[in-house]
């Protein structure tokens, strides 16, 4: 129960054991950096020129230093309309199998094709109020096995957005969560996903 920003915080805080490389093409990329630094997560920001995407070369140059174990990228930057070339970035990330990839897809998930598993995205964050066409108030994310395993090496994951704690609770107890869920939006999303599947 939060906006997408909450799970962005959960992603970078739960998955960064060493240092995060944050790639910004606008306001929401800058938000990744603000979240990381506000939570004491060591991080560096790599900005593109206004209206330009994060390039695979930028990602490769940063990761080749060996300083980073997490990268944060905005898929579709609402403030500029730039959509990052995630297919090409995914190819670069194959060279760095230990790096956890966190993606803000708040304004694109359910509106753009994002093959999370094929691309190798470890944590994809979205929320209900954009392409899912639901009221705001609930964020959802994917969590890869690699990202889950990484969380074990991060000592200060926080409480409310501790992805490991949330995942473990859901796996152990049906219909139980670490915090009070937004049940009304969960029902609405269930219906909306059924409608999407029927339409194809």
For the regions a protein language model found, what residue spans apply to each?
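General beta-strand structural signal in soluble alpha/beta enzymes
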Residues: 1, 45-46, 72-73, 101-105, ...
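Conserved beta-loop-alpha segment that forms the PLP phosphate-binding cup at the N-terminus of a helix
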Residues: 1-21, 25, 29-33
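Short, well-ordered, mixed-charge alpha-helical segments that flank or form enzyme active sites
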Residues: 30-31, 52-56, 60, 78-83, ...
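Active-site-proximal loop->helix
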Residues: 31-42
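Active-site phosphate-binding strand-loop segment of PLP-dependent enzymes
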Residues: 53-108, 123
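Conserved active-site segment immediately N-terminal to the catalytic lysine
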Residues: 117-129
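Active-site C-terminal subdomain of aminotransferase-like
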Residues: 129-200
């Amino acid at each position: 129960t939060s906006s997408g920003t909450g799970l962005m915080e959960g992603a970078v805080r739960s998955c960064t054991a060493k240092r995060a490389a944050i790639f910004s093409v606008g306001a929401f990329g800058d938000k990744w950096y603000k979240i990381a630094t506000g939570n004491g997560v060591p991080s560096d920001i790599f900005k593109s020129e206004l209206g330009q995407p994060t390039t695979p070369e930028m990602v490769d140059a940063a990761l080749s230093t060996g300083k980073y174990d997490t990268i944060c990228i905005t898929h579709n930057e609402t403030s500029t309309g730039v959509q990052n070339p995630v297919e090409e970035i995914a190819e670069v990330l194959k060279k760095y199998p230990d790096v956890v990839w966190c993606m803000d897809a708040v304004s694109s998930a359910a509106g753009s094709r994002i093959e999370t598993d094929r691309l190798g995205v470890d944590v994809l964050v979205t929320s209900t109020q954009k392409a899912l066409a639901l009221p705001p108030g609930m964020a959802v994310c994917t969590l890869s096995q690699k990202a889950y395993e990484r969380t074990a090496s991060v000592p200060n994951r926080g409480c409310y957005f501790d992805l490991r704690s949330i995942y473990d609770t859901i796996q152990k107890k049906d219909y139980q969560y670490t915090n009070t869920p937004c049940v009304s939006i969960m029902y609405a999303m269930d219906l909306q996903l059924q409608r999407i599947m029927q339409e194809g």
